[in-house]
Regions:
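Weak global preference for isoleucine
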Residues: 1-4, 14, 53, 68-69, ...
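Active-site gating/metal-coordination segments in enzymes
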Residues: 1-52, 58-61, 74, 88-89, ...
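Structural preference for beta-strand elements that scaffold enzyme active sites
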Residues: 2, 36-45, 67-69, 105-109, ...
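Active-site gating loops and adjacent loop-to-helix segments of metal-dependent hydrolytic enzymes
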Residues: 2-23, 66-67, 74-80, 104, ...
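Generic structural signal for well-ordered alpha-helices
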Residues: 30-34, 56-60, 94-97, 142-146
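Alpha-helix C-cap/termination motif
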Residues: 39-40, 62-63, 103, 148
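H/E-rich (His + Asp/Glu) clusters that bind or coordinate divalent metals
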Residues: 79-167
Length: 167
């Protein structure tokens, strides 16, 4: 089961194609539905933004029997206020990832960092990024996830064609 919970105060970061509300992961009605997943032996894919990772950690701690898969490395944001605080964004994201990784029922998908919301300026360049440019840009995130979760709880993902939007 995948549910998009990606929400932020900045309206520019909200995808108008779907309805998302603040604090959804803590909502009692959401959690009542979430409780059914373990009974059905279903996993949960979480697509959210990095400021919401701590909410996902709380969910994982309260439902240790449900496998949770964090999509897109936890959605580190790089637009708006987050662009101006990129060093703080990485530090905050990393701290939250390490805390989430302590929950043994959580896995992480490595990918999805090519979206414009991640703040890379690839779409402003004349040519698409090279493999080396992508590897250099994404390495800190992939490395942190692999170190925190271990290789047994990491998986690669494709986010095509959405990632192509940034280049």
């Amino acid at each position: 089961i995948r549910h998009i919970t990606a929400w932020d105060d900045d309206d520019r970061l909200i995808n108008k194609s779907y309805s998302v509300k603040k604090g959804l992961l803590a909502d009692p009605n959401f959690r009542a539905g979430f409780a059914e997943l373990e009974k059905l032996n279903l996993s949960f894919d979480a697509w959210l933004y990095h400021p919401q990772i701590d909410d996902l950690t709380d969910l994982a701690q309260n439902f240790p029997g449900t496998t949770i898969i964090l999509d897109h490395c936890g959605g580190p944001l790089g637009l708006g206020e987050y662009a101006r605080a990129s060093t703080n964004v990485f530090a905050s994201w990393k701290k939250s990832i390490e805390k989430l990784a302590a929950c043994r029922n959580v896995r992480v998908k490595l990918g999805g960092l090519g979206m414009r919301i991640n703040g890379y300026d690839f779409h402003e360049k004349h040519l698409p990024p090279t493999s080396d440019e992508l590897a250099k840009a994404w390495f800190p995130y992939f490395d942190t996830c692999i170190q925190a979760f271990g290789p047994d709880r990491c998986m690669f993902e494709s986010n095509f064609p959405v990632d192509k939007g940034s280049y």
